[in-house]
Amino acid sequence: MKLKKLYIFYFDIYEYFLCDLQLSETNEILKYIKNNIDKYTNSFNSSYIILKDFNIITNEVELQSYYNFTEDSKIKLNNTDLILFMTPYKIERIYSKYNRNFNQYRWFYILNNIEPAGSYKINMSNLQNINIYDKNKTAYYCKNPKLLFLTPIEIDKFIPVSRVSIDIECQHFGEFPTPNKFPISHICIDWFMESNINPVKKIITLINYEIIKNYKGEQKDRFIYTEIDELLTKDKVYITIYCTEKYMLHFILYTLRKDFDYILTYNGHSFDFTYIQGRRKFYNLNELCLVNAHKSNELKIYSYNKDTTYEIDSNNGIIFLDLYNYIKKIYNYNSYKLGEIAKERFNILSKIIDNGDEYIIMPLDTADNKNKVSIFYDVIRTANYCFINNIPYKIKDKTKIINDKEKLYDPISIENSLYQQFKIYKNNTPISDETTKVMLSKDDVDIGNKNAYVNFTKDKSDDIAYYCTHDTVLCNCIFKYDMIHDKVIAFSNEYLLPQYMSFKYKSTTNISGLLLKTLFCNRSMIVSGNLEFEKFEGGYVLEPKQKYIDSITAVFDFNSEYPSNIIEANLSPEKVEKVIKLQDDEYAVDIVENYLKEKYPYPDYCYMLIKKDKTYKFIVMDRRKPGIITQMIDKGMKSKNEYKNLKNINKNNPVLYNYYTSALYSKKITINSLYGLLGSERFDFNSPYCAEYCTALGQKCIKYIKNLVDKSRYIDNNLYLNEQNNPFSNEPVITRYSGNLDVNFTFYIIYGDTDSLFINIKFDNKFDNKEDLVNKSHECFQFLSNIINDEKNIILSKNFNFEYEKMYIWMLLLAKKKYIGEVVSSMNPLQLISDSKGTALIRRDCTEIHKTILKNTIDILKEYLTNNCTIQDVNNKINNYLMFTFKNIIENIQNLDINEFKKSVKYTGIYKDPNFYIELCVKKYNSKNPNDKIVKGQRFDFIYAHEIDIWDIETKKWNTKYTS
């Protein structure tokens, strides 16, 4: 049998210390280190690099006033020779203003021109074979990584990614299990050792027979490594072993010593692995350890972020990935429980057929299901329940999907299962919808019940084993279908971090890798200065001009507005030429502005005048050469467009398509985070002036387009825009543009928000039908988009694109950032979908009864906007509906569905008042539910209620004094 070959490469990873050359010659410690390196060049495991004539830049700015605004106040630092020490120990207690907190791996990647997740052709002659701790592996030492990774290559084939998903269950009797008291009852392992040569995919279930009542059957007491090696080679997918708990603990250690790329758990860093460590301690076993090339290390589980996030750092190439931490970092969900996450991902639209004591589920062949069906049928193979309207239904028959559990991973069986029907048992909740969404989640087995382990029989243990199996498969499927490995690769390359650190840090730390790389490419280094951070105005939001819009409205927005602003004005901290602050003196403002126009002309420079309260502030930027931050944005934007193009080109190659999708995602995050970092005091190269300029330029651009387009007319095939000056060059723009639309109309700006405008169109003549109206409106909006974005018209600079995004046929503009309407999703045939922002319809903290009342009220208003009803008819309908609804609630208050009155809130655990009602509610709940506690950052449901001792006539009046 052909086996894959695994090599381990050893490199020298140093501690890095950067300072100017002069300091290295005057400081006694640095001088001693440098002399030793020079003296013992070949034997001393340290070195240094001289960085000649580096450009030193700073974010510090000297504020000017009316009395000195003509003076040159730009802080200019001389070029300097720097020295970068590379030592096996950390150089401490020596201050160097150049020694930023750059991760040691980033220096390694940059100095050796290596992509952390790149592919390279390796010349083995650059390696030296060495003996290592693990005798089963081949290892090499590399003295010159730059030479070794000289030839990058592109891989368009699937590179196997091996992972193992682990889930444990523990014995308990109603209280939360603790390792010093309760044994582990089950460990389930989804062993997914992918390989192009010899893949091994198993579901291994370990069951503690010692706690099973009157257990009789095959059992394992002594763990023998070679037995497991042999077992894994057998052609059997499901392996169930009844064993002692000690055997289970040895098996976990055996698993961790295999060459997996990922160890997957869900909340396993804070519970599963901590519990396993505790049980090993209970038996006086050594703690779990990881074997790397040169030694064995104990598995270290640590917490930061106030004990809400637990991490396991790996030093042997395995990535310990807690999917709970990953989901919380990447997504914003109501709940981060595995069951709720699964429902979000694994669902399809299906037809429901009532068939006696069962329902038949028939998935629909729709566009919405197209990208979901293969995922759904992969997950359902181990599921025992499905969920409809959040109600669990036990699966009765899925033999058309999988009739032999040994075919769990069989690709032909999976392919043949797509769109096959399955049956579910009926329960106390009938399904009234003919078509509905069917979701997969954790199985509806309440192992948290205090009686789950009472009279614990083999049958009971097997039921829990099925549940445990499905949990591990869910984790594996989340990993697979969320393309987590592709994201790890993309973020690793983007942040210049080892792959196991891809999701570890926040934006301020993540971006420092790209910052260092850009600085190094420019032969530059930063010196941070003292800056004043003041609050400044945010994005420009217009008040809605109308509430009820019964005509066609388009949404236009600036594509990547803030990154475009940074490129346009060269908003990099070292490019701030002047900041002049004036008091409330318009005469002085005019003098300063005229001076700046003459002394700092566009396009070499640009400036922004910002008025706040009774002060004026001029910020002048040097545009002659792109700054460091501008280069980062510009390169990121170009890469984003390149990845977008490559993604489309490779849509038939799933490997490259997934890679470019994730690369595009990581680029977007980087590009969009830089504006916020400029205004963050935690970022090394920040600038409140650049951040304020960026926001002000955004306001200026959106106001400019608003003033240019609002009430502009298209008459006799000519569009007449309003007279405006270009916001960048201050030159007047052309206002007349010819077309061939053959209609007369007027554009109205009815709303705007930060980077977008809502443009309403009013035609002089009526159309015969809705389709013609929509088609012509689309044509007119497209014409406007072409006019604004055509570089020949010089309405915008080349860095900006004001895109026509979507079109509403009616809208309700309720308030700023709150609107509802119907969007055109397809032109031919005409199809509409509902859309809303900021309303209770999509807010998580609003009750269902609130959403229902709002939705029905909107439907009445929609009828008014689309069917020419009178306003009086609409008012009557709304009043009658609301009166009926509230009367019905009051009269049936004893029989109301409590679920309709639930509110949702995120528990922060940080409240000024210790008696705050949310804090008291959570503490009370957690004391009663120790095995299902609400943790910090988790969203939960609650209701406002008052306990009634006697239900009398007075209480029935529902007086507010009885509510709390």
Swiss-Prot record:
A GO molecular-function descriptor: DNA-directed DNA polymerase activity
Disulfide-linked positions: none
Primary enzyme class: transferase
Gene Ontology biological process terms in this record: DNA-templated DNA replication; viral DNA genome replication
Catalyzed reactions per annotation: DNA(n) + a 2'-deoxyribonucleoside 5'-triphosphate = DNA(n+1) + diphosphate
PROSITE patterns given in the database record: DNA_POLYMERASE_B
Record keywords: DNA replication, DNA-binding, DNA-directed DNA polymerase, Nucleotidyltransferase, Transferase, Viral DNA replication
SMART domains the record matches: POLBc (SM00486)
Enzyme Commission number(s): 2.7.7.7
Function text: Catalyzes DNA synthesis.
Family: Belongs to the DNA polymerase type-B family.
PANTHER family in UniProt: DNA POLYMERASE CATALYTIC SUBUNIT (PTHR10322), DNA POLYMERASE DELTA CATALYTIC SUBUNIT (PTHR10322:SF23)
Protein name as it appears in the record: DNA polymerase
Species assigned in the record: Choristoneura biennis entomopoxvirus (CbEPV)
